[in-house]
Design a protein with these regions (language model features):
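Short S/T/G/P-rich N-terminal loop/turn motif that feeds into the first structured element of a domain
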Residues: 1-45, 49-63, 70-95
Length: 95
């Protein structure tokens, strides 16, 4: 079953770019990644083919990269959910 997380942290997009440089560019199982600024900092929405693939990426790649760049505490998802439907109507890229 597809799985999604929504995380918000009081960090900058530049900091997230530093983390991105340390993890695989196209991790196995990632379907969709949305990242943007919020009033608090940065929010990230990720959709995965399965919770197992999300958990594996977090444990093997993202948690170590976050610990290296951000330190503790590592931001925990605000929300995680089993996904019943994913619809992408066209590819959108924003710099």
């Amino acid at each position: 079953m597809p799985y999604a997380t929504i995380t918000e942290a009081d960090h900058t997009l530049d900091l997230f770019d530093q983390v991105d440089a340390l993890v695989p560019r196209e991790p196995e199982g990632l379907v969709l990644l949305i990242r943007g600024r919020t009033e608090r900092g940065v929010a990230v929405v990720s959709v995965w083919r399965s919770r197992e693939e999300s958990d594996r990426f977090f444990a093997d790649h993202l948690a170590p990269a976050l610990a290296q760049v951000v330190g503790d505490p590592i931001p925990a998802p605000l929300l995680s959910l089993g996904v019943s439907d994913v619809a992408v109507r066209g590819q959108v890229g924003v710099a």
